[in-house]
Amino acid sequence: MKSDFFCIIIGLLLFSCEQVEDVSRIQLDEISFTQKENVINNSINSFSFDLFHLLSNQNSTENVFVSPFSVSCALGMVNNGASGITHLEIRHVMHIPDSLASSLNNYHLKLIDGLPCLDSSVTVKIANSMWLNEEVLVKKQFKQKNTTAYKAVSQQLDFSKSESVDKINRWVSRQTEDCIPKIISDLSPDNLMVLVNCIYFQGNWQSPFEKSDTHKEQFFCADKTVKDVYMMHQLASFPYRKNECFEMATFPYGNGSYAMTVLLPNVDKSWRECMDMLDGNSWKTWMNDSTDNMLLDVKLPKLLLKNKYQMREILSAMGMPNAFTPRADFTGITEKMPVWIEEVIHASYLELNEKETKASAATALKVTFESEWVPIEPVIPFYANRPFVLVIHETGNNTILFIGKVFYPEK
């Protein structure tokens, strides 16, 4: 499989790069959720698998890699200006109950503040921004909500100038350590704003692979072809689970606050049977099950995956079509009407090698107005030498940061 990548929403420029990358943080042992925030976390994980499945179906023979967390931050920011049916649909896409609508901002803020502080040896950068058309008045309350809850920086730009596109792209490149060098191609004077989220992750394996143990081996692709790829190898103990559809091995980073869990379909099951088992409830059950470290003979392909997605049709199919039409209600953003989401662009990056994992994503959400609307025990062998799913997640609450499928390893 090839990988699909989800990712980043573009952020405001009023904060300097140094402010976003402030390292004088208090170290956290865990992120402690309230009961309401736990419900929202489970809801966002369900949204994560919904998004993954639709992207996977749309790119059925391709790799997929995406950051649902990034997309949820972008949707959370624009939802702060939504009302009526538009507000309802955005929340329902993220599985947020009506009674918890007011808690979504606090949930995101707790993660934006907490995720970078869980492990000093792992780099997690989260940045949000609002890029505003200098010709249009945006409501102060909308900007204040996103500044407070999403730490979003904001800057007014002349959307008629190509320099504005370059400025946004440079900001994204900086926040993603050059993993995402370009997120948008153009701007129009009819665009009201661009909301952006960026997430960058870099973690060293707790148990690294030896380069001398990496060799070319066969990978059995979904289309029945066989490809020679560089396969990393080690014999070590890792958390291991097995059920009727998957073998699951968890590979921790740093102090264990973050990990990558690889879900390898059982050889006697079809890919479709296994995908049908993947949802938020299953993820919660599997991750909460007690498990012992097992001695594994691990083979894992080196990866370098890059992709970009137009998310408008995906998000519309997930249940929020109203936001992409002139019927959308974004009266919380501006008095200027009609206003709607023109496009949502998502770019992602994944690199796996013997030492570390680097993952990044960017989501740019363009809001527009007045333009033409276009619809749209013994040693257990764990050989990831056939298509598999991978999830990069925080381990305390099992919050999903990135999720992907690998059909055809690329390096």
Feature-to-residue mapping (PLM):
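Non-catalytic, conformational "gating/processing" segments within enzyme and secreted inhibitor domains
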Residues: 101-266, 292-374
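Soluble, non-membrane globular domain cores that form compact, hydrophobic packing
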Residues: 18-19, 136, 186, 282-285
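Short glycine-rich loop/turn motifs
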Residues: 48, 245-248, 347, 385-390
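C-terminal or internal capping secondary-structure element at the end of a domain, subdomain, or sheet
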Residues: 382, 387-411
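Internal alpha/beta scaffold segment
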Residues: 265-291
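Detector for small/aliphatic-rich hydrophobic stretches
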Residues: 2-7, 14-159, 170, 406, ...
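Short, basic/aromatic recognition patches
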Residues: 371-383
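Short Gly/aromatic-enriched secondary-structure transition segments
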Residues: 90-94, 209-218, 272-281
